[in-house]
Regions:
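A short beta-loop-alpha structural element at the N-terminal edge
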Residues: 6-20
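Conserved beta-strand in the GNAT
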Residues: 56, 61-71, 77-79
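Conserved acetyl-CoA-binding loop-helix of GNAT-fold acetyltransferases
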Residues: 90-107
Length: 136
C-alpha cells in the first residue's frame, strides 16, 4: 500500500467492484468511458469476467481515483485505464497509479501494457502509451 496526499493506494482485484462502480458513476458524465449507468454496469460485469486487476486510490475511505488492468486472452498483453474524479487531479494519483500498473504487469508477467487516461481534464492528461515490461 502507498499513501499519496492522505490517500491510500491499494491493489484490489475485482473484490472492490462495488467501490469501482460507484467511482465510475461519480465521474463527470461527459468523461465517463462507458457512458450512462447501464454502460457502467456492463463494463463492471465485463471486468469481473475478464479477470481484471483493479487498483484504487482511497481518500477518507472512498475510491476517488482508480486504474484497471485488463489482460488479453494470452495474459501477456493488457489494456489499462486510469480514472480520476473531479477535484482530485493534482494529488499525484496519475503517477502512483501508473507505477502500480507497471508493478502489477511485471508481477503478472504481462509483457505489453497500453495505458489510457479516461478522465478529461485541462490540468492533467496522460497520452496513450505502450510499455514493454521485460519480465524475467
Amino acid at each position: 500500500m502507498a499513501f499519496v496526499h492522505a490517500a491510500e493506494i491499494r491493489v484490489l482485484g475485482t473484490t472492490a467492484i462495488e467501490d469501482y462502480h460507484a467511482h465510475l458513476l461519480r465521474l463527470d458524465r461527459a468523461s465517463r468511458f462507458p457512458g450512462d449507468e447501464r454502460g457502467v454496469d456492463a463494463h463492471c460485469l465485463n471486468l469481473l469476467a475478464s479477470g481484471a486487476i483493479l487498483i484504487g486510490a482511497y481518500v477518507k475511505g472512498v475510491m476517488r481515483a482508480s486504474a484497471e488492468i485488463v489482460p488479453d486472452r494470452t495474459a501477456r498483453r493488457a489494456e489499462a485505464a486510469i480514472t480520476i474524479e473531479d477535484g482530485f487531479y493534482d494529488r499525484g494519483f496519475e503517477r502512483e497509479l501508473t507505477a502500480k500498473i507497471l508493478d502489477e504487469a511485471r508481477r503478472c508477467h504481462i509483457n505489453d501494457v497500453r495505458v489510457h487516461e479516461l478522465s478529461t481534464s485541462r490540468s492533467y492528461k496522460v497520452p496513450t502509451f505502450e510499455v514493454h515490461t521485460h519480465s524475467a
